[in-house]
Amino acid sequence: MILINSLISSFENYKDSQKEKSPLGNYDESRFENYAKFCDSLRLELEALKTEEFNTDAQISYDLLHFVLNEAVVKYQFKTHWNPILSDAGFHSSLTYRVRPLTNKKSALKYLKLLKAIPKYINQQSTLIKKGLDAGMGQPLIIFKGYESTYDQHITKTAEENFYYSPFLKLPSQLSVIEKDSLRQAAKEVIIKDVIPAFRLVKSFFEDVYYPNARSAIGVSETPNGAAYYQSRIDFYTTLKETPQSIHEKGLEEVSRIRKQMQDIIKEVNFKGSMADFIRFLRTDPQFYAKTPEELLKHARNIAKKLDEQLPRYFKTLPRKPYGVAPVPDAIAPKYTAGRYIGTSKESTDPGYYWVNTYDLPSRPLYAIPSLTAHEAVPGHHLQGSL
């Protein structure tokens, strides 16, 4: 047990010296290579241990550490850092997660440093993504419909109307007027000088470089080494010995099972019409939709509190850090998911947040809120990440 604890300690204490030099991290190719080499070396040390002498706790620790180390090596082998883009997220839009209330002067100065680091971050990420495009690893063009909203909204005429300026609109009351004015002036300067030009570069990169070279094929298996990569994702997400075909067959079985349940419900509620009619009813009847963003948030908060009260019945240890229920920021809402959990570090005084997307209310049915809340807040990601 001592030996495996030593390896766990080595993994937890790994320091990326270059990453620590920038508030947004280092995205140079060497960083990913060095980390993969470190994990591969540690994995070999781990595999050399005599597991037959392990007790249950040691075996669990071994399995988990091996799983994490192996995934780090596999991700580098497939160069996943060359493709940090999804239909609802990207290297640039993830910056919005850093926009939080400023609680004191120290946090404000730290946030200003973060904003100043955005140009370097954008340049490094663009370089990596260009490598992915050249290697045929880009995302399919079809997923980028409406994607311009993820960068156009940050190209503002003034600093004050920029989303990244919003934390300075309400500064802590303990700051003096002079301190507040100084911080706001510094924020305006860095947004005009660094943030807005950086997002102009993002716009140019996507519209002049990425979109013209995006692939038309949708499936990742149609990319170079794509079938092997897809299998690696099956291995990671299921932790089972499955194949694409076996998962597809399970999916068909689930579709059949769920469809039967839906048909039973239609009969149970005495709905007059076909399944297509029932689905249309669920998607269009006003009774299932909030009329205002505030109504949707209120409903989500109500469900969250009902889930909170059930936690002690099922979990012995609960997190001390609370979570709030808040709307997805307008800057990213149009291309964002229905909800998301935004965590925070244990050292931070900030709470976690369960974000609810209040954009396009006709696409946000109230009956989806219970499962969304249980997944994103409790007993889902907040409970999981705060312990």
State where each predicted segment sits:
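N-terminal maturation segment of proteins
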Residues: 1-387
